[in-house]
Amino acid sequence: MEQQSYTIIDETGIHARPATMLVQTASKFDSDIQLEYNGKKVNLKSIMGVMSLGVGKDAEITIYADGSDEADAIQAITDVLSKEGLTE
């Protein structure tokens, strides 16, 4: 299992567009990928799960990936978070 923590810097947090990008990216991988915020974990392949967390600015999140392509999944998600301006 791999994990990576991030601080969200976007003023609006993880809103619809970047959430969609994260879900689409996570869905490309076979690994089980979870997003944790405020002690609650959701499947990162579920747009409803991601949006239900209400992740805002300055939030600390952790991504967990477990499976054959876990390292690639974490890297791809890190790239999306950076490209979407959610993290530095």
Curated annotation (Swiss-Prot):
What organism is the protein native to? Staphylococcus carnosus
**Main location per UniProt?**
cytoplasm
The answer to keyword Transcription applying to this record is yes
Residues in a coiled coil are none
- Family as reported in the entry's similarity comment: Belongs to the HPr family.
Any Gene Ontology CC annotation: cytoplasm
Annotated protein name in UniProt: Phosphocarrier protein HPr
What UniProt keywords apply to this chain's record, in alphabetical order? Cytoplasm, Phosphoprotein, Phosphotransferase system, Sugar transport, Transcription, Transcription regulation, Transport
Stored PANTHER family: PHOSPHOCARRIER PROTEIN HPR, PHOSPHOCARRIER PROTEIN NPR
Q: Which residues carry this modification: Phosphoserine?
A: 46
Q: Which residues form the HPr domain?
A: 1-88
Gene Ontology biological process terms, A to Z: phosphoenolpyruvate-dependent sugar phosphotransferase system
What does the record give as the function of this protein?
General (non sugar-specific) component of the phosphoenolpyruvate-dependent sugar phosphotransferase system (sugar PTS). This major carbohydrate active-transport system catalyzes the phosphorylation of incoming sugar substrates concomitantly with their translocation across the cell membrane. The phosphoryl group from phosphoenolpyruvate (PEP) is transferred to the phosphoryl carrier protein HPr by enzyme I. Phospho-HPr then transfers it to the PTS EIIA domain. P-Ser-HPr interacts with the catabolite control protein A (CcpA), forming a complex that binds to DNA at the catabolite response elements cre, operator sites preceding a large number of catabolite-regulated genes. Thus, P-Ser-HPr is a corepressor in carbon catabolite repression (CCR), a mechanism that allows bacteria to coordinate and optimize the utilization of available carbon sources. P-Ser-HPr also plays a role in inducer exclusion, in which it probably interacts with several non-PTS permeases and inhibits their transport activity.
> Which SUPFAM superfamilies does this UniProt record tie to the protein?
HPr-like
Which Pfam families is this protein grouped with? PTS-HPr
Q: Which InterPro entries match?
A: HPr, HPr-like, HPr-like_sf, PTS_HPr_His_P_site, PTS_HPr_Ser_P_site
Q: Where in the cell is it found?
A: Cytoplasm
> How is this protein's activity controlled?
Phosphorylation on Ser-46 inhibits the phosphoryl transfer from enzyme I to HPr.
From which domain of life does this come?
A: Bacteria
Keyword Nucleotide-binding appears in the UniProt entry: no
User: Active site annotated at which positions?
Assistant: 15
